[in-house]
Amino acid sequence: MHYDPIKNVFASLIKKYPFLRITFYKLLDIFFLRSWYVRRELMKLRKAFGAKTIEIYDAGTGFGQYSYFMSKKLNPTNIFSVDIKEDWIKDAEDFFSQIKTQDIKFNTEDLLQINHENRFDLILCVDVMEHIHDDIKVFSNFYRALKRGGFLLINTPSIYGGSDVHSNEDESFIGEHARVGYSQEDLVNKLHPLGFMTYKCQYTYGFWGDKSWRLGIKYPMILLNFSKLFFIILPIYYLITFPFTLLLMILDYNTKNKIGSGINFIAQK
């Protein structure tokens, strides 16, 4: 299954009206459990910097929802948000200009080719690395871009059921993925030789979270991939299922998962 065609539908719907984009951001924050985990860690990292202005690199900003959150909740900040999709960057740039946000700048960048030097205090990389074959090159670029003591927060599927792969015979549920995901050991083995050290690691989407993802994300996406007409019945579907999905998400969020289909990894330079 491919997410990008569905993402492009949403991108076209929200591009003209700021209130629609803000509403869309809030819905993403509610429906995607990974957003719960990422936002919690961002708030904790903000405290680690005290009152100083932090320079943030949103590496693979997508719709721009995390840049919006960080601009609102992590102040004072200067945020540099990039994505490889030029049209999405243009849409995000127009939106933040309309709502008169001054602390975010945008650019189209390929993470394999960036050459920032000792520029950022924090790099946020959410659901990006599973799309990139040469991940070591990107991690090396991130290390060079960070200031000494800076943090890299990676959120990605794990090898334990990420992309809905549970055995060697399974294919990734997401067609755009270059790999199934990572384990803690994978990330340690790739990041530590570059000079990073592990600050924190947490598996997400454990027993409860995996069930919430299937009910709240996987099954609706399968329907939408089959036909965009299913957009019409989505509100009814979520009206029936979301109370159960929300309960499962809350259970996962408050559980220390020994293993899970997602992973939050924070490295420090």
Where in the sequence are the language-model features?
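Short, flexible hinge/linker loops that cap or flank conserved catalytic cores
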Residues: 50, 73, 257-259
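S-adenosyl-L-methionine-dependent methyltransferase catalytic module, highlighting the catalytic core
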Residues: 2-37, 65, 84-88, 95, ...
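Conserved SAM-binding loop
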Residues: 39-46, 54-165, 265-267
